[in-house]
Amino acid sequence: MRMRWLLYPRLALTNLVKNRRLTLPYLLACAGTVLMFYTMDELSINRGLSKLRDAASVQAVLFLGVLVIGIFAAIVLYYTNGFLIKGRMKELGLYSVLGMEKRHISLVLLLETLFTGLVGVGVGLALGVLFGKLMFLLLLRLLGETAALPFQVSLEALGQTCLVFACIFALILLSNLRSVKKARPMELVQAAKAGEKEPKSSAFTTVFGLLCLGGGYAIAILSKSPLDALLYFFVAVLLVIFGTHALFRSGSIALLKMLRANKRFYYRPAHFIAVSGMLYRMRKNAAGLANICILCTMVLVVVSATVSLYVGQEHALRLQHPRDVSVEIQGQAAESLEDADFYAMAQQLAAARGLALSEHAKTIAIRCYAEQRGSYFDFDGVSENVCRLYLLPLEEYVAMGGEDVALQEGEVLVFSTRSSGYGLDKVELLGGSFQVKEELAEFPIAERSDVSLETGVYLVFANRAQAELAMGGRQWEAYLYEGFNLLGEEDEKLAFSSEYCNLVNRKIDEEAEIDYAVASSIYLDGQRWQALHGGFLFLGLFLGTLFMMATVLIIYYKQVSEGLEDSARYQTMQKVGMSKREVRASIDKQIVWVFFLPLAAAVVHTMVAFPAISKMEALFFVNDMGLMLACTLATIAAFSLLYVAAYLLTARVYYRIVS
């Protein structure tokens, strides 16, 4: 009896070793997903990260990564297990024919799943513990953190990883047991060789796919604002996924049938084998090709977007901070604070830290919100095309470093933060119409870009009386801006910024009649942005690696499963007169069709999504289109090289099988 029960563990181990062509990649995938999940989970709860200045935002990004990796790991392992179990159906059927009951087969599958899980989770956790410190240091590097923070292995993360993957393997086991329980012995024997009936090209599916794909593309291209792009992007993603599956299923079949109808093309040995073989199993291939395409698109979008955010943060910071340090106050108390010498406070603090101040700018302006309708600014209809209006006298514009221009009453200088500029010859306000003497190409305390949800319009009048007259008797509040740049050591700039902003904010808090007040620094915000964008880049690279691993795994199993199905067929073709060269040519055509069409479609999806992605990145104040395009193209080039390498490696497996 004891020997009988020892038979099943031995049989399970023998099966895993004998089928190593299928089980080894699966074990590597298990170990890889465990490694990535554990690493992300360990970092998200690491006590060392809690000592960072913006630990909450970093850990929130990492926790999001834990959820995404956990869900995707379950999908990838479940999907690839389907390839694995189908390749072994004949073997399991033979066990049944030879007298093993289904409960015995189920026991073997249970033990195989247990051994696979133990090895996969064990290797993944061992690698996670081994390289955890390295990943921690990489994350700190991306976050711009130079201080040495403590790192220790988290027992909590180890336990959570074991629990999550125990659940995943339990679901996979239940799926395998269900397949065996439903099948009959001869069905198990024939399952591995079960072919697909020639699918029909459905006009409805084709039209549905075109509509979905067209709708998704339209949303991505026609979104006018960052908010529109953000709100509708995930709708576009779903439409593109549905459209991709529908068109790969029906469009590819229609194309193959068109090639088959072309007798001059079809009745050549290489074309005949490739086209007929693809058409015969197209229903299965279509789903696989669509999944590969979607995974490739996910890699390209996630990596290019996070790299763009990280690389473009310096330019984005400068758009938000025309001066290194600034104070902005709006309210009835703003004018009363004009005598509060914030600049003198800064000079004292800077001298104590060995810093110098430069490019000082200060103004008291009128700031209000209005809806722009052509040249008319409506103060009562603030709904769409919202603008922040700044009205200031010429003398203060000149004092900030602007050019001294002779302005008459009824004339204004205009600067718009919109990249296209203002573009009109007059400005109509409640107090009358004003002729635009000159549209300014630059302004001392503002930059031109489209990253903000609101356009800033600066109007320079001949004197303060003209600016107040332009309001047409409407009640307004003063706006105080004071800013300057810092010269000196970077560490001292950061320390100065923290101390100065705290002092100014405490002084401002003493005033009750203030609607808006903030003291800010490019160095403090830069530290916060580095933490947020560094966390996003780390997550993007992690997810990109995970998606790439899933892509390679699916490609590999498709090569193996198709090679096993095609082996006997190609040997038969050689026996009836086809040369090895002709067989190899037909294989090449089929492989290229199967594995490079998804890459081409993914590149198209990514480039169509680029306008929407660039608008969403504007919410993070990244608006350098040249930089974003360069990051996207570089990501496509790098991924294409990896994809070609994966294709070449897996194609060798296919050739060995069919030969």
Label each residue range with its predicted role:
Residues 20, 26, 109-127, 199-206, ...:
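Selective transmembrane-helix segments that form parts of the transport pathway or gating/packing helices
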Residues 64-79, 550-551:
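Long, hydrophobic alpha-helical segments
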Residues 22-30, 35-39, 163-168, 197-309, ...:
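Alpha-helical transmembrane segments, especially those used as permease/efflux helices
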Residues 317-330, 336-549:
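Basic-flanked hydrophobic alpha-helices used for secretion and membrane insertion
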Residues 32-45, 79-83, 90, 116-145, ...:
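Small-residue-rich transmembrane alpha-helices
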